[in-house]
Amino acid sequence: MMASRRISVLSSLGLFACLLSPVVAQTFTYCNPLEKDDCPNAPALGQNYTTYLNSSLNPDVWNATSGLVEISDAGSNFTIHKALDSPTIQSFFYIFFGTVEVHMKAATGRGVVSSIVIQSEVLDEIDWEWVGSEPDKVQTNYFGKGNTTSYDRGKTFDIKGAMDDFHNYTVNWTPEKIEWYIDTVLVRTLKYEEALGGKNFPQTPSTVRLGIWPGGDPQNKKGVIEWAGGEIDYEKTPYIMSVKELKVVDAHKGKEYSYSDRSGDWQSIKVIDGVSDIANEINKPPPKSLAQRWRELPTAAKIAIFASIGGLVILGMAIIAFCCVKQRRAGRREFSMENSKFVEDQNNVMAMRTQWNHKYKPVGS
């Protein structure tokens, strides 16, 4: 019931997030456990999870907000079509340390930002970000408990073809360190003690968020617009970020995560045993095809079906034969009637001709 309540609340607040500025919507939290004691427990993933984004996303697993996510054979396209579009998907499940691997192609365009965000309700955050005016670079960043007093935590790395080709971007997150990988190559490591002695180290249960947003929208702050490469040109839409595969590993096995106090320390998080409703939804087998259903039928049922089909075929053939015979008989009767009428007409003509011959006398006879 707690997980269901949380999903309902997140869905409702997802609509509210659509009304916020793109920056706020990307980092939205609806109940901060550092400020409130009655926040609902976080439903755990509690397992490994892989999904290919070339089919519709399960609405019981993912919350889509603030724009259109278009599905294609190659994956999901997060598209900015108009002002303030910032299509984003956010998992309903939470992971408490683990691995997030995303195969994606970032969007190009001045003022356009593509992002992968691992974020908790206390605003712990681990980021990948691409600025559309920098086609061969990717930025990594982190925040602890919403602390934005300093923006010197980010590091930028070269990545050829980030906006032309799909690449593998992976975060490995443990209580001791965070590692960022590009195409399986380690590019950055952040140790716990390096993040202000651990105070700014992301360490609380987090959702996974993928999205694109107009960092260069005129409504954003000047500093954000400058960081995004300048004002976005909405006349040049669409701007598209594409994702084809996502792998998530939760380091813990459990049903829910709860905060035992307001410290925000990972040691204060309780792991509640069980399996979450979301995990059950993920593990639910897909609908079976007709071929699979047929193979699973017992032999007696198959024989009965074949017999029924055979009976229907025989009945159909009998009906067709009956109709043919009936039609042929009707045709014969009609032909007989027409033939009798023809003979009668011929006899009448011959009789009239005989009478005429008897009455006709040649001139001079």
Swiss-Prot record:
Those parts of the protein on the Cytoplasmic side are: 324-365
Q: Which PROSITE patterns has this protein been placed in?
A: GH16_2 (PS51762)
Q: Which residues form the active site?
A: E125, E129
**Domain GH16: start-end pairs:** 50-243
In this entry, the parts of the chain located on the Extracellular side of the membrane are 26-302
Q: Where is the signal peptide?
A: 1-25
Keyword check for Protease, yes or no: no
**UniProt-listed InterPro entries:** ConA-like_dom_sf, GH16, Glycosyl_Hydrlase_16
Could you list this entry's UniProt keywords, alphabetically sorted: Allergen, Cell wall biogenesis/degradation, Disulfide bond, Glycoprotein, Glycosidase, Glycosyltransferase, Hydrolase, Membrane, Signal, Transferase, Transmembrane, Transmembrane helix
Highest taxon, organism lineage: Eukaryota
Any idea which positions bind chitin?
A: E129, R209, W213
Localisation: Membrane
The UniProt catalytic activity note for this protein reads: Random endo-hydrolysis of N-acetyl-beta-D-glucosaminide (1->4)-beta-linkages in chitin and chitodextrins
Q: What Enzyme Commission number(s) apply to this enzyme?
A: 3.2.1.14, 2.4.-.-
List residues traversing the bilayer: 303-323
Membership in a protein family = Belongs to the glycosyl hydrolase 16 family. CRH1 subfamily.
Protein's job = Dual chitinase/transglycosylase that plays a role in cell wall architecture. Chitinase and transglycosylase activities are coupled. Required for the polysaccharide cross-linking at the septa and the cell wall. More specifically, transfers chitin to 1,6-beta-glucan in the cell wall. Plays an important role in fungal pathogenesis. Involved in cell wall assembly and regeneration, filamentation, and adherence to host cells.
* Name of the protein in question: Crh-like protein ARB_03382
From which source organism is this entry?
Arthroderma benhamiae (strain ATCC MYA-4681 / CBS 112371)
Q: What is the lineage of its organism?
A: Eukaryota, Fungi, Dikarya, Ascomycota, Pezizomycotina
